[in-house]
C-alpha cells in the first residue's frame, strides 16, 4: 500500500490537470529557493493568481538566502546583502507592505586605499568632496554620473511595464525593451571600454570605478558595462537597510503569502503531460527521506549555473533537454571581526586620528576588497559608532578566507572572527549567452536576470517578471509577452 501512494498521488494530479481548463487557476505552484527572489515571486504569484492557489517553497538552507545575519557579542549584523538603493522600488514596497522600518542611518566617512596610501578621501563637506574629485580627475566624475543616470532612467521603465502586466521570456528581450540594442550590447562590452568612450579617464577608472566594482561584485572594470552601471548607481545614490535585518523581508513575504515552506533539497524536476498539458514532478530529499509532488507551475529561484556542482538539481523528460551547466560564480567571503583596527597599516600610527568607517580598495592590496565599521541591525536612539581606538565590529569582504597573518595585518588584536562564504554573484564573462526565464511552458528560471546584473532589487524585478510571465502564459494572454515598442503601448493605455 505504501508503494501505491506515490502512484495514486500522480494519478490524482494528472486527473486534476486534465480537468483544469478555461479560466481555472493553477492548483499548485512550486518555488525552489526562499531567498529574496523566491520569497518575492511567491508573493507576486499569489497576488496574480489569488489566495486559493497552494504555493510550496522549497529551501535547503535558511529562509533569506543571501540576506543573512551573524551574531557577534549578542548583537546581529548583516553578513549578506547589507543595503539597498533608494530607487529599489519593489523593496520599498515590500517594507511598507510588511510594516517594517528603515534602519536609522549612522554616518561614516569613506576612502579608497591603494595599498600604500589613500587614493581618495571623503570629507564632511560636500563641496570640498566635489572639488577634490575635480582636482584629481577633472570632469570624469560628471561624465560617469551622466552615463549612469542615462542607464538608470531607461532601466526604471521596467516598473511601468510591470504595472501594465507586461513580461519577458528571456533576459535579452527584457533588456531590449528597456534600452534596445544599447542595453544588450552593454552585456558584451566592458565597463572600462564603455566609460572610455564617453570621456572618462583611465586613471579615474583605475582609482575609483574599480574600487566600487570590487566592493559590489569583487570583480574588475573588465566586467560587462550593464552590470557595472547598476553597481555604480548604488554607489551614487542614498542607501538604506531594514531595521531588524534585511532578511525580515523574505520571512515576512512568505508569512504574508501563507506559503508552505518545505525544508528540503530539490533534486530533480521531471516533465509529465496529460492531454497536451504540462505537469511537473518535483523530487526532493530531507532528513526524513526522499519524496516528490506534482505542480502546474515551477519556479527555480536559486542559481543553476554553479561550476562547483553545489547545485545538484537535474531536469528529466524535457525535449530538447534543459541546459543548466554554463557559467561560473564569484566566491565572496564576509568576515565579521570584533577587534581593534591596525590603523598604522593605513598610515595612521595614532588610532584616535583615523577618520574612516568605510574603506574600499583598488586592485592592490588583493587579499581584501572592503573594510567597514558596521552597525548592528537594531540601532537604538542612543547608539553611537565606536571610536577608531575602541574595539568594534568590522566587516571584511575578501575573495578568499583570510589567513591569520592577513587578519593581523588589518587588526592589532581581535576577540572573534566569524565568516560567511557566498557564491555571491555570477562571474561575468564566464557565460557566452544570456539565459532565458522560460525553460518550458510553465517552468521558469528566476535567477536568469542576475547574468545581466546582480542585486537584491534586480532579483525582485525578476520575481515580478516571472510571476507575470507565468500568469500571462497560463491564461494565454500572449499580447502581454515579449512585446516591442512598449513605451508607445504603455502611453496609449493610459
Swiss-Prot record:
Keywords: FAD, Flavoprotein, Glycoprotein, Oxidoreductase, Secreted, Signal
Principal location class: secreted
GO molecular function, one term: prenylcysteine oxidase activity
Signal in keyword set: yes
One GO BP annotation of this record: prenylcysteine catabolic process
Signal sequence, renumbered to the chain: 1-22
Disulphide bond pairs: none
Residue positions the entry lists as glycosylated: 342
Cofactor(s) demanded: FAD
Pfam families in the cross-refs: NAD_binding_8, Prenylcys_lyase
EC category: oxidoreductase
Enzyme Commission identifier(s): 1.8.3.-
SUPFAM superfamilies on file: FAD/NAD(P)-binding domain
Subcellular location: Secreted
GO cellular component: extracellular region; membrane; platelet alpha granule lumen
Recorded family membership: Belongs to the prenylcysteine oxidase family.
Purpose of the protein: Likely to have oxidoreductase activity. Required in the mevalonate pathway to regulate prenylation and enhances the bactericidal activity of neutrophils.
Protein name (Swiss-Prot/TrEMBL): Prenylcysteine oxidase 1-like
Gene source species: Homo sapiens (Human)
Gene name of the encoded protein: PCYOX1L
Amino acid at each position: 500500500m505504501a508503494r501505491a501512494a506515490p502512484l495514486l498521488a500522480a494519478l490524482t494530479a494528472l486527473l486534476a490537470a486534465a480537468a483544469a481548463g478555461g479560466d481555472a487557476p493553477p492548483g499548485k505552484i512550486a518555488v525552489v529557493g526562499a531567498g529574496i527572489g523566491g520569497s518575492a515571486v511567491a508573493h507576486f504569484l499569489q497576488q496574480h493568481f489569488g489566495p486559493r492557489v497552494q504555493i510550496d517553497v522549497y529551501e535547503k538552507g535558511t529562509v533569506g538566502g543571501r540576506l543573512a545575519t551573524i551574531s557577534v557579542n549578542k548583537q546581529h549584523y548583516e553578513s549578506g546583502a547589507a543595503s539597498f538603493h533608494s530607487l529599489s522600488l519593489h523593496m520599498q514596497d515590500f517594507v511598507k507592505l510588511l510594516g517594517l522600518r528603515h534602519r536609522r542611518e549612522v554616518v561614516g566617512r569613506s576612502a579608497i586605499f591603494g595599498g600604500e596610501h589613500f587614493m581618495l578621501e571623503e570629507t564632511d563637506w560636500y563641496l570640498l568632496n566635489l572639488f577634490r574629485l575635480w582636482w584629481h580627475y577633472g570632469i570624469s566624475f560628471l561624465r560617469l554620473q551622466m552615463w549612469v543616470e542615462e542607464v538608470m532612467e531607461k532601466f526604471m521603465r521596467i516598473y511601468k511595464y510591470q504595472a501594465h502586466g507586461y513580461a519577458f521570456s528571456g533576459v535579452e528581450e527584457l533588456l531590449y525593451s528597456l534600452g534596445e540594442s544599447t542595453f544588450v550590447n552593454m552585456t558584451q562590452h566592458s565597463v572600462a571600454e564603455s566609460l572610455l568612450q564617453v570621456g572618462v579617464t583611465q586613471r579615474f577608472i583605475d582609482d575609483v570605478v574599480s574600487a566600487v566594482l570590487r566592493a559590489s561584485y569583487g570583480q574588475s572594470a573588465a566586467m560587462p558595462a550593464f552590470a557595472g552601471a547598476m553597481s555604480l548607481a548604488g554607489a551614487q545614490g542614498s542607501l538604506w537597510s531594514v531595521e531588524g535585518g534585511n532578511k525580515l523581508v523574505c520571512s515576512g513575504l512568505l508569512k504574508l503569502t501563507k506559503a508552505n515552506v518545505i525544508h528540503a533539497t530539490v533534486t530533480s524536476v521531471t516533465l509529465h503531460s496529460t492531454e497536451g498539458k504540462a505537469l511537473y514532478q518535483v523530487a526532493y530529499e530531507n532528513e526524513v527521506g526522499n519524496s516528490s509532488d506534482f505542480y502546474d507551475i515551477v519556479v527555480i529561484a536559486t542559481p543553476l549555473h554553479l561550476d562547483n556542482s553545489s547545485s545538484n538539481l537535474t531536469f528529466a523528460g524535457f525535449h530538447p533537454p534543459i541546459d543548466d551547466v554554463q557559467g561560473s560564480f564569484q566566491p565572496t567571503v564576509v568576515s565579521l571581526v570584533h577587534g581593534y583596527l591596525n590603523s598604522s597599516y593605513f598610515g595612521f600610527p595614532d588610532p584616535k586620528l583615523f577618520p574612516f568607517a568605510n574603506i574600499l580598495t583598488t586592485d592592490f592590496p588583493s587579499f581584501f576588497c572592503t573594510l567597514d565599521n558596521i552597525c548592528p541591525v537594531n540601532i537604538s536612539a542612543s547608539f553611537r559608532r565606536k571610536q577608531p581606538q575602541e574595539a568594534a565590529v568590522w566587516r571584511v569582504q575578501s575573495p578568499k578566507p583570510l589567513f591569520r597573518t592577513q587578519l593581523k595585518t588589518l587588526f592589532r588584536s581581535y576577540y572573534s572572527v566569524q565568516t560567511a562564504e557566498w557564491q555571491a554573484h555570477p562571474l561575468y564573462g564566464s557565460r557566452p549567452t544570456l539565459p532565458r526565464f522560460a525553460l518550458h511552458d510553465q517552468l521558469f528560471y528566476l535567477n536568469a536576470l542576475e547574468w545581466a546584473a546582480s542585486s537584491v532589487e534586480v532579483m525582485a524585478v525578476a520575481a515580478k517578471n516571472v510571476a507575470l510571465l507565468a500568469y500571462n502564459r497560463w491564461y494565454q494572454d500572449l499580447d502581454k509577452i515579449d512585446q516591442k515598442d512598449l513605451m508607445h503601448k504603455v502611453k496609449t493605455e493610459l
